[in-house]
Swiss-Prot record:
Signal peptide start-end: none
TM spans (from-to): none
Positions that bind Mg(2+): S102, D241, D243, D245
Family: Belongs to the phosphohexose mutase family.
Stated name of the protein: Phosphoglucosamine mutase
Molecular function terms from GO: magnesium ion binding; phosphoglucosamine mutase activity; phosphomannomutase activity
Cofactor: Mg(2+)
Species in which this protein is naturally found: Acidovorax ebreus (strain TPSY) (Diaphorobacter sp. (strain TPSY))
GO cellular component terms, semicolon-separated: cytosol
Post-translational modification, as annotated: Activated by phosphorylation.
Residues carrying Phosphoserine: S102
Cofactor note: Binds 1 Mg(2+) ion per subunit.
Catalytic activity, reaction form: alpha-D-glucosamine 1-phosphate = D-glucosamine 6-phosphate
Amino acid sequence: MTRKYFGTDGIRGTVGQSPITPDFALRLAHAVGRVLRRTQERPTVLIGKDTRISGYMLESALESGFNSAGVDVVLLGPLPTPGVAYLTRAQRASLGVVISASHNPYPDNGIKFFSAQGTKLPDAWEEEVEAALEQPPVWADSASLGKTRRLDDAAGRYIEFCKSTFANDLTLRGLKIVVDAAHGAAYHIAPKVFHELGAEVLAIGCAPDGLNINHQVGATHPDALVRAVRANHADYGIALDGDADRVQMVDAAGRLFNGDELLYVMVAARLARDEHVPGVVGTLMTNMAVEEALQRRGVKFMRAKVGDRYVLEELQRQHWLLGGEGSGHLLALDRHTTGDGLISALQVLQACVRSGKTLAQLLADVPLFPQVLLNVRLNPGQDWKTNPVLADAIRDAEAELGAHGRVLVRASGTEPLLRVMVEAREAEQANRCAQRIADAARAG
């Protein structure tokens, strides 16, 4: 079944344009509520959000929609996406709802859902909700309407959960860490997590005004973090995105480390402690150098489709624990049910503290292959798959690279973009091939 509203990470778009409107949010919540009530007499849902100004409007609309379907609501306020996932499970709620467009700018927003177990829901559930949206509403009678309350200590509960994933015998004392929360959902949480574990913390990107989320800060704009680490002679820098489910890190020299590298550090740390790591799941975008390095250490590597939900599905199929994406969505399923930027950063810092090595030293034998990623904006109705010029350009690039590189061309699941990725042993070759493919896509 083709889904009308749900993309790879919930429902997302520009605020005020369908489907990110208050009337749709109310209808959506009502439809979800009806689906929940098919199996539960009195469901409870948790609603968290990031710091976009539109979050207030969408939160109110969702609350009304759920209440009108006979569903109780617990408001969490600004909270990272993984924090909502954790509290949904900890509070024994029926469902978790996150209002966020993750790394997108403030004019965008989105709505995504977590199961009672704190995991992202399968396509089949989203299809059931879309089918319910096509039916006329059935309002609960007055005696059956849902109620709403606020969980005032949601942030504190999540802070303690994050800290519990860091080894009790270790501390961050003596480390100076710059924390960039992207003016997003972790602005009041991330600095406290690292401070309470002993670090000296310098916070940037922690002053949201409703309009500045992800603006020139955070995991998608790490230049500000690099500058702050160098200027303040910090040991590490940690950049989250708007909903804090992804992370990038910087060392004392100002070198940036992406999710592929951080995933390798997490795996290597377990191997160093003689823990069994049978396999790791990456994506079609994961750097070949990481795959080769893991295989040299006897760790199987599998590629899932791009998107942390697909990494999670493959991990569950294989009964493995570790996976992630270069964007910084990292999964350690014995620590959390979903990708968590804060917990991932803590796992990496734990590896550094325990080994006495820097990130650069831990990654000395994993030099990444040059990887070029270009975004080509698609026109409405443009079918890139039937573009013969593009097909020829892709075929030519693959022939040139042979076994020493990769080409991946795919449509974004959240924006009207065609993503072109080329990986090669030489940067100049990767750039040249990627540019040829992007030019061919624009010509179509």
